Amino acid sequence: MHATTVKNKIMQRDNYKEIMSVIVVVLLLTLTLIAIFSAIDQQGISEMGRMARDLTHFIINSLQD
């Protein structure tokens, strides 16, 4: 009886850790998306397009070296 109780408590703790890990990942992804969209909004679409173009040229030039 005691071993079953201990086993159940360990399983509950593992489930709690797993649920908390999922919650943390979801929160971090949400904050990342908010930061990205906020940056896009502040810079404007044309500015983001210019930055993407510059980054693409940089990557292509780096690969050619």
From Swiss-Prot:
Signal peptide: none annotated. Induction: By acid stress, via the EvgS/EvgA system. The keyword Aminoacyl-tRNA synthetase does not apply. Keywords: Cell inner membrane, Cell membrane, Membrane, Signal-anchor, Stress response, Transmembrane, Transmembrane helix. The keyword Transmembrane applies. Residues 40-65 are periplasmic. It is a single-pass type II membrane protein. Residues 1-18 are cytoplasmic. GO terms for cellular component: plasma membrane. InterPro entries: SafA. Connects the signal transduction between the two-component systems EvgS/EvgA and PhoQ/PhoP, by directly interacting with PhoQ and thus activating the PhoQ/PhoP system, in response to acid stress conditions. Interacts with PhoQ. This is Two-component-system connector protein SafA. The gene is safA.
